[in-house]
Amino acid sequence: MDLAALRAKTPDHWKLATAIRVLAIDAVQAANSGHPGMPMGMADVATVLFRNHLKFDAKAPNWADRDRFVLSAGHGSMLLYALLHLTGYEQATLDEVKNFRQWGARMAGHPEYGHLEGVETTTGPLGQGISTAVGMAIAEKSMAARFGKKLVDHKIWVIAGDGCLMEGISQEAIGLAGKQELDNLIVLWDNNNITIDGRVTVSDVTDQKARFAASGWDVLSCDGHDAEDIDRALTAAKKAKRPVLVDCKTLIGFGSPNKADSYAVHGAPLGDAEIKLTREAYGWEHGPFVIPAEIKAEWEAIGAKGAAERAEWEARLAALPAGKRAEFERQMARGVAPKLAGAIRAFKKAQSEAAPKVATRKASEMVLAAVNPVVPETIGGSADLTGSNLTKTSDIEDFMPGNHKGRYMRYGIREHAMAAAMNGMWLHGGVRPYGGTFFCFTDYARGAMRLSSLMGVPTVYVMTHDSIGLGEDGPTHQPVEHLAICRATPNTWTFRPADVIETAEAWELALSSERTPSVLALSRQNLPTLRTKHEAKNLTAKGAYVIAEAEGKRQAILMATGSEVEIALKARALLQAEAIGTRVVSMPCMELFAAQDEAYRKRILPAGGVRVAVEAAIRQPWDRWLLGERGMERKAGFVGMEGFGASAPAERLYAEFGITPEAIAAKVKSLL
């Protein structure tokens, strides 16, 4: 490629793009770690995007109506960091660029949400960014429908690489976006034909443009190093009536004489000698991390070009009726709906009196019927299991082309994209997403669920059919290890409610959470209401509490969750009949219990006596409460699952696997 000809054709563009490239090269070299090739290859596309098309104001990084820019190919993080520094984001200082990938740095190896303003989402696991962006596009459409396009009218731009498009989640996401006709979503494909193993063709022959077209997208192409051709394609993309893929043909490591267009430049520093040659090829005579003042000033002018449009937008916002403005600002700031607590309180009181015997998945539906009318920002959904997850209430309609006021997503059999899209909805602002599937299929959503926890995104995962209690569908659908997996994930609340009251309390906590996602593990089988005396306080917020106290001298404590709390209470009755004083502790959320002060934990689980945990899942998460926290191994037992389940009616399964009142009582007596 003739670099001199490109430099001569668009000299102003060349200087701006070269500033990105050299910052990326220098930061990776200084860190002795990173990925310079992608920023070098996509600098031209990014320059045209930020200079001519992206709506943003670097001095107001959280402006509600800004365009969102998602770097799905997160390994190329220095592309984003260089842009944020050059355009004048306050937190993106040159010192931070120099501190790339170091302890305490805002500029982490892969972009991390919450570390640096301008980073819209955490990326790095390939395919997550493009899928999260689909959720952002859905949220934009929802907010525009509710508040009007004078307040909400922006695009979601994504840079994705070959690896993003190979990941299975990408097909789920592009299929969902195509079905929803999300014309506010534009994906810029860094088509450099290189992976770590070599040419893309060593592992893939997919016609990506045909794949996107078949999924309902418009497809455009450009020379990713020709500023005028890039501008033409991006201008056309903004006018499309469907989501757009722009095929940007690029060279990875553009300008490196010996490493461009090879995997050698993907994930390692260029080295001093190659950097010298590359600078010469660019015509860049400045030292490491030196950006001439006139180039920095031009970039900062680009960063300020949205200020006037933002001021006009703020005037429109200020002119709204006070109530509408306050509600818009609350939803964008992700504030808790003011009527939520009252709705939950009234629901609990009514259900304590009615004492229904319902599955907790049905209880969840009942809670949502009370909550959705007073929390207008909820958008629910299911991965093709609406009738089983019971996630749709009668007051909400489907979100679809032509009805963006709808608050229910038909995700199809796309668990992973559903989870990522929900992350994107919350990150955009204005939406509280929840979505359902069978608990066993958290396996299909795991990558995005982990990012919920890592980012501090309070997505609500409605996971029904939570144990062998689902019955005849058998071990392929019966979760036994999944509670342990969710509980092992940092910054996750895993709720397994025992009845309709605990279900309501779990929902209140999930919809009030600021920075922690929630998993609601809900039963298929009917469970009785255990708390028939109304308690205004949210007992689930403590994580665990005494649901039945020992009569006489306490000799044993039974700990249980979900459907097994009822079984534990029946075991208590057997033990009490033999004068064995037994306390039953319901533990709907281990994480919240662990967060309580030691005095409370000691009050619920005092030292001495036998402890038995009961749960139709594996033992692994329970040893903290059985062996630790004042427990003793010789006095500790577990009644639950040791392996996978089986296909049979639920009642038979509980009997065959020994999760019965009689087995629990026998376990206690064997430990006395």
UniProtKB/Swiss-Prot annotation:
Matching Pfam families: Transket_pyr, Transketolase_C_1, Transketolase_N
Cofactor note: Binds 1 Mg(2+) ion per subunit. Can also utilize other divalent metal cations, such as Ca(2+), Mn(2+) and Co(2+).
Residues that bind Mg(2+): 162, 192, 194
Superkingdom per UniProt: Bacteria
InterPro entries referenced in this protein's UniProt entry, alphabetically: THDP-binding, Transketo_C/PFOR_II, Transketolase-like_C_2, Transketolase-like_Pyr-bd, Transketolase_bac-like, Transketolase_BS, Transketolase_CS, Transketolase_fam
Active site: 415
Cross-referenced Gene3D superfamilies: 3.40.50.920, 3.40.50.970
Annotated site, Important for catalytic activity, chain positions: 35, 266
Record flagged with keyword Calcium: yes
Keywords, sorted A to Z: Calcium, Magnesium, Metal-binding, Thiamine pyrophosphate, Transferase
A molecular function (GO) term: metal ion binding
Binding positions (thiamine diphosphate): 75, 124-126, 163, 192, 266, 441
Co-factor(s): Mg(2+); Ca(2+); Mn(2+); Co(2+)
Gene Ontology biological process terms in this record: pentose-phosphate shunt; reductive pentose-phosphate cycle
Protein task: Catalyzes the transfer of a two-carbon ketol group from a ketose donor to an aldose acceptor, via a covalent intermediate with the cofactor thiamine pyrophosphate.
Family: Belongs to the transketolase family.
Assembly mode: Homodimer.
Protein name per Swiss-Prot or TrEMBL: Transketolase
Organism: Rhodobacter capsulatus (strain ATCC BAA-309 / NBRC 16581 / SB1003)
Lineage: Bacteria, Pseudomonadati, Pseudomonadota, Alphaproteobacteria, Rhodobacterales
